[in-house]
Every structure is written in structure tokens, then in C-alpha cells.
Amino acid sequence: MRDCDLLVALDVDGTVLHHDGHLAPAVLDRVRALDALPHVHVVIATGRSVLSTVPVVEQLGLAREGRPAVCSNGAVTVRTDLTNGTGYRLVDVVTFDPAPAVALVRQELPDVLVAVEEIGVGFKVSTPFPPGELWGEEIVVPDEELLAHPATRVTFRDPSSTSQEFTELVERIGLHGVSYAVGYSAWLDLAPEGVSKASALEQVRRHLGVEPHRTVAVGDQRNDIEMLTWAARGYAMGQAPAEVVAAADRVTGTVDEDGLAEALDEVLAELA
């Protein structure tokens, strides 16, 4: 059984990387040890855009031709392409109409910052975001252009609010026709309805021919809940909110304690 294909899905921020972007040597060592096994598929599954995912894949030494990665909380799936200059090729893109949800949120927070992802470019934004929060080009555009086309992801940011206030806002207004996740700061991501890291990983699993009971996932935030439930073994990082811990099978150390290395040690010993 240990020789059967195994899929290991890893969140990035707060899991692979520390919140300051640091990659711990212990984590890098365990990821590469797993990736060296021919029957193990290490797959990045992140809320990051494609542009900010590719450098992480490269930093981990995972940039092998055809390797899948799940980006934008499941709305965008890519495979490594070492021939076209971008480092990736698009495999699946799911979009939705962002206008109704943006109107609802703005009724409650008229000054909220809004960003709409532009694959391979960056983001169209209503107002510039705090420095360092968005990867790629930020293009300030009027609302008619911001909301004119179907989107893979819409991000709301209110530097004066808290994560709890955003959670209460979502529960109060009701958001229909979309999937959503509140970040650890006052950050709200919208994705197409029914789309999550889990939905994209299920397609990856089937393509790779991995059996459902041979799946592992590690994550730390609310956008990881579906992925942790989907996996046969889900690990929550030690700093994860209570609802994320509840969705997991096991809890590992915090990101500051290199908890991912601890979890992958278990995977190497018990499953791989």
C-alpha cells in the first residue's frame, strides 16, 4: 500500500512559508524528501495568484514539467511549463460575475478596497492596496471596468476592520452564487460558487490516478477547511482558527515551530 501513489497538498502562507515569507530549512528538507519518492505527488494549493505561486514552486524545487498547482483558492489550476517563459500553462479556469457580490459588500462598507484578479498580470483595483499585499501589477480602474468581465477571484480589504468583523459582515448580508473565505486579517476572498481548493484538488487527484484514501492536506486558514475535509488525512497548523482545527484529523505545530516539517515527518513514516 505504501507504494501506491500518494497526493500531498500543501497550503503556502502560514504553512509552507512563515508570515514574513521565510522558508524554513527543515520544511524545505521534508518537502524535497517527499518529492524524491517516485509515487508521491506534492501539489501546492493556495489562495495566491499564479504569479505569486510560481516562485514558491521554484523555491521548493518542485518546478518539474507538468506538475499541477492549484491557485486562487481553486479557481485556477496550472501545470509547470518550462518551455514558454512564464513557468506555467493554464489547465482550468473558473469564473463568475463579481458585480452583485461587490454591490452587497459595498452597501455595508462603501470605502472597502476591491481587487479583481487578472491572471498572469496582477490585479485591477478600485484603490491601491497596502504595500506588499498583492503580487503583480496593480491597475487602478473605474468600477465599470473593474466589474465588466467574469472574474476568477475578487478580494476585499478594509485596513480599519478585523477578521471577526468581516466574518460577521458575511453572515449578516448573505453572499449567494459565490464561495468565500475570510483571511486572518480583514481580508475577504470570493470565488465562483462551489469552487475551493478541494474541488480543484479532486480534479488533480483523478487526473493523477491517486485513490481517495491516499490523499493528505496541510493548511492553516479558513480557505483550507474544504481541502482538509476532502483529504483522507488533513493536518491543521498549530496557529489555525478553531473551525480549521475542527475540520482536520490532526494538528501539528505552528508555522513558527516548523509544524509542516513535523506533519511531513509523520507522512514519510506512516504513509509514504
Language-model-detected regions and their locations in the chain:
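Active-site phosphate-binding/coordination module
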Residues: 25-130
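Short, structured coil segments at secondary-structure junctions
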Residues: 60-65, 173-176, 230-231, 246-248
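Short acidic-hydrophobic, aromatic-tinged amphipathic segments that line or gate anion-handling sites
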Residues: 92-94, 139-142, 251-254
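Short, hinge-like loop/turn segments at secondary-structure boundaries
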Residues: 60-63, 86-89, 131-135, 197, ...
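Conserved acidic, metal-coordinating active-site core of Asp-based
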Residues: 108-218, 222-224
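Mg2+-dependent phosphoryl-transfer enzymes with acidic/Ser/Thr/Gly-rich catalytic loops
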Residues: 2-7, 24, 191-272
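Asp-based phosphoryl-transfer active-site loop
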Residues: 4-21, 44, 228
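Short active-site oxyanion
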Residues: 38-43, 65-67, 153, 213-215, ...
